[in-house]
């Protein structure tokens, strides 16, 4: 399943988040990062594929102390076509 994660890092946590990101010591079991795009400030977006919502929850939980994350499920063109076909 495809997901978009929109994140916002609170100002007081920017340095800690940068340090954690620099070590890339994050658990990704069951999750594949497609890409990350960072704004100049404290926000960004990540595209990923997850086997299930538990894998996604575990991934996002490890960042929950430093930032707010909104998770949005996504569909491919093919999946949208299946929805439209009924």
Please give the residue ranges for each predicted region.
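Conserved, structured core segments of small domains
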Residues: 1-86
């Amino acid at each position: 399943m495809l997901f978009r994660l929109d994140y916002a890092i609170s100002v007081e946590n920017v340095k800690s988040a940068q340090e954690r990101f620099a070590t890339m010591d994050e658990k990704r079991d069951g999750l594949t990062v497609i890409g990350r795009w960072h704004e100049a400030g404290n926000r960004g977006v990540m595209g990923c594929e997850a086997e299930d919502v538990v894998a996604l929850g575990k991934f996002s939980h490890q960042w929950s102390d430093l930032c707010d994350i909104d998770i949005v499920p996504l569909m491919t063109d093919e999946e949208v076509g299946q929805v439209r076909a009924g």
